């Protein structure tokens, strides 16, 4: 079995394992860059992602997978210029083993985990906006990571974000059309009832019964309440207040 046939078989069996690396598998020869080519790869680093079929021969083949911390880079390995980036720009000189190891550790994965670290929102999450929209860069301020939320850029930025006329006004709580009588009635319903003075006829009947007995009975209370158009509670309260008033006047108590 040659290398090209083995590559096609790998792509057909494991299409998800190759992804964007399928373009490298058309030539039939192994294609790996200096950074992607490890010197020794163990089975534990590849097994979480896919397994090899049983009919693989000794021919050459190309595959794409994620490597874990189990790869090893020799001490004397030297990477050519342009393979790795340093501070956002291509390096003009070869990169030694120490610098490459520090960069590779930043993009390493947990051993035995099939996915990478969760993405943390930071400054790089903000998309690039035109200079005319952002204004002068000297007046821009740095954004912190705390409370950062991804902005939905699917909508057009030129559309109006806020319109005062679209806002619905809240209904007025106080209506000026209410009359003073309605306001007074509502206040009396919520709080204490308005005091209504007794009429002369009511006071005459109450005083006559009080002169007869200072403690009214149940039958007399019902009779006076029905004759004076008062409630039994009002009659009882009037007798209580009348007795308190007599106690405050000593001369009346002596005569009694």
Curated annotation (Swiss-Prot):
Keywords: Developmental protein, DNA-binding, Homeobox, Nucleus, Transcription, Transcription regulation. InterPro entries: AP_axis_regulatory_Homeobox, HD, Homeobox_CS, Homeodomain-like_sf. It is found in: Nucleus. It comes from the Eukaryota. One of its GO terms (cellular component) is nucleus. GO terms for biological process: regulation of transcription by RNA polymerase II. Residues 191-250 bind DNA. Pfam families: Homeodomain (PF00046). Belongs to the Abd-B homeobox family. PANTHER family: HOMEOBOX PROTEIN HOX-A13, SEGMENTATION PROTEIN FUSHI TARAZU-LIKE PROTEIN. Sequence-specific transcription factor which is part of a developmental regulatory system that provides cells with specific positional identities on the anterior-posterior axis. This is Homeobox protein Hox-D13a. It comes from Danio rerio (Zebrafish).
